[in-house]
Amino acid sequence: MNRLPSSASALACSAHALNLIEKRTLDHEEMKALNREVIEYFKEHVNPGFLEYRKSVTAGGDYGAVEWQAGGLNTLVDTQGQEFIDCLGGFGIFNVGHRNPVVVSAVQNQLAKQPLHSQELLDPLRAMLAKTLAALTPGKLKYSFFCNSGTESVEAALKLAKAYQSPRGKFTFIATSGAFHGKSLGALSATAKSTFRKPFMPLLPGFRHVPFGNIEAMRTALSECKKTGDDVAAVILEPIQGEGGVILPPPGYLTAVRKLCDEFGALMILDEVQTGMGRTGKMFACEHENVQPDILCLAKALGGGVMPIGATIATEEVFSVLFDNPFLHTTTFGGNPLACAAALATINVLLEQNLPAQAEQKGDMLLDGFRQLAREYPDLVQEARGKGMLMAIEFVDNEIGYNFASEMFRQRVLVAGTLNNAKTIRIEPPLTLTIEQCEQVIKAARKALAAIRVSVEEA
């Protein structure tokens, strides 16, 4: 039987939610009730699969499934009031920490003026953010399209490349094995994970994948496409593969890809949704090799962990295909005043506090600690790797990776796996993590591995 709409039920549910939003703390009974509600509503109205996916953080009790609020700049608090060091960073959105006061203040001030733009008048913050990004990004990148997510920024990049290269008879895209560029139809065509791709086949035609980090494979693909008349419009890749398991290419790889793109007349699209905004020790990961892309994709940390925003920044030559008709690719909420306020404040914090340099320093400290643990536990840990504050610990099998996330949760440190590599646990904390918290994370990892070794030996 079809369920009839119920205005009364919707009104009661929304009123209950507003009451919770107003509260700073919950008593014990309220906490238990909220946990039950959240789990039930996820099961019945969001997606029950998420409950299974988050089993590593529910191993210590279902209270762990319910996030309540930010703690300090680098911590989260659950409904029991227990504080966790955040080494997941919302998959890379909290580069300047949780509720960074500069970012929150900028958004609150803009909220008091005008939350969203009229769509007809020129909005000043969009202009100022575009100018700021033109100054901040490498090379000749000049014009920005704003959206709401990393996937959307990749979609815009693909469409820009198509619009620019189609008159030149170039329609093929080359992406890399292990890549993750999002899950909308265009971005998914560039993503290289069968689990995400197969249910939506056929995807967009014209996409080829080559091994990441293998410059000869890239050259061969570009050459073969040219020989067969399937000339390449663009090469799209991540400077470091995040969801692929924090995979670093060989030194000089990005430089070599840039040269190949120039040689074959292909555009270079760099997806820095996860590696950008100071994460790897530079403002953008491509700066480690002084590589200048034709199109750059940003999102995640651009909004300072307060507002969602993505950006696609391109050279004037490429972006000019939208000059005659700027409505060829638009989005209602892209570049809205609240999101732009957050992004401008985020950039200001990153530069004022020199957080990219801090990411390099603290990342080296953490990675040294994880590599020492890999030497102490070779039966469990295959490798520790990373750059800046984007790190990964790869285990000998999937089960140990899951157990490590669970044990770290018991040690009050939040970590999680990567989407394309189940054996790998990602370490992606805020760049504002303190030295003391870095030391706590390493101690927690040592305790977690010791507990896992005992359980393996007893099994």
Swiss-Prot record:
<keyword id="KW-0032">Aminotransferase</keyword>
<dbReference type="InterPro" id="IPR015424">
    <property type="entry name" value="PyrdxlP-dep_Trfase"/>
</dbReference>
<dbReference type="InterPro" id="IPR015421">
    <property type="entry name" value="PyrdxlP-dep_Trfase_major"/>
</dbReference>
<feature type="binding site" description="in other chain">
    <location>
        <position position="274"/>
    </location>
    <ligand>
        <name>pyridoxal 5'-phosphate</name>
    </ligand>
</feature>
<comment type="function">
    <text>Catalyzes the aminotransferase reaction from putrescine to 2-oxoglutarate, leading to glutamate and 4-aminobutanal, which spontaneously cyclizes to form 1-pyrroline. This is the first step in one of two pathways for putrescine degradation, where putrescine is converted into 4-aminobutanoate (gamma-aminobutyrate or GABA) via 4-aminobutanal. Also functions as a cadaverine transaminase in a a L-lysine degradation pathway to succinate that proceeds via cadaverine, glutarate and L-2-hydroxyglutarate.</text>
</comment>
<dbReference type="InterPro" id="IPR005814">
    <property type="entry name" value="Aminotrans_3"/>
</dbReference>
<dbReference type="InterPro" id="IPR017747">
    <property type="entry name" value="Putrescine_aminotransferase"/>
</dbReference>
<dbReference type="Pfam" id="PF00202">
    <property type="entry name" value="Aminotran_3"/>
</dbReference>
<feature type="binding site" description="in other chain">
    <location>
        <begin position="150"/>
        <end position="151"/>
    </location>
    <ligand>
        <name>pyridoxal 5'-phosphate</name>
    </ligand>
</feature>
<keyword id="KW-0808">Transferase</keyword>
<keyword id="KW-0663">Pyridoxal phosphate</keyword>
<dbReference type="InterPro" id="IPR015422">
    <property type="entry name" value="PyrdxlP-dep_Trfase_small"/>
</dbReference>
<dbReference type="InterPro" id="IPR050103">
    <property type="entry name" value="Class-III_PLP-dep_AT"/>
</dbReference>
<comment type="similarity">
    <text>Belongs to the class-III pyridoxal-phosphate-dependent aminotransferase family. Putrescine aminotransferase subfamily.</text>
</comment>
<dbReference type="GO" id="GO:0019477">
    <property type="term" value="P:L-lysine catabolic process"/>
</dbReference>
<protein>
    <recommendedName>
        <fullName>Putrescine aminotransferase</fullName>
        <ecNumber>2.6.1.82</ecNumber>
        <ecNumber>2.6.1.29</ecNumber>
    </recommendedName>
</protein>
<dbReference type="GO" id="GO:0042802">
    <property type="term" value="F:identical protein binding"/>
</dbReference>
<dbReference type="GO" id="GO:0030170">
    <property type="term" value="F:pyridoxal phosphate binding"/>
</dbReference>
<comment type="pathway">
    <text>Amine and polyamine degradation; putrescine degradation; 4-aminobutanal from putrescine (transaminase route): step 1/1.</text>
</comment>
<dbReference type="GO" id="GO:0033094">
    <property type="term" value="F:putrescine--2-oxoglutarate transaminase activity"/>
</dbReference>
<feature type="binding site">
    <location>
        <position position="332"/>
    </location>
    <ligand>
        <name>pyridoxal 5'-phosphate</name>
    </ligand>
</feature>
<dbReference type="InterPro" id="IPR049704">
    <property type="entry name" value="Aminotrans_3_PPA_site"/>
</dbReference>
<dbReference type="GO" id="GO:0019161">
    <property type="term" value="F:diamine transaminase activity"/>
</dbReference>
<dbReference type="GO" id="GO:0009447">
    <property type="term" value="P:putrescine catabolic process"/>
</dbReference>
<feature type="modified residue" description="N6-(pyridoxal phosphate)lysine">
    <location>
        <position position="300"/>
    </location>
</feature>
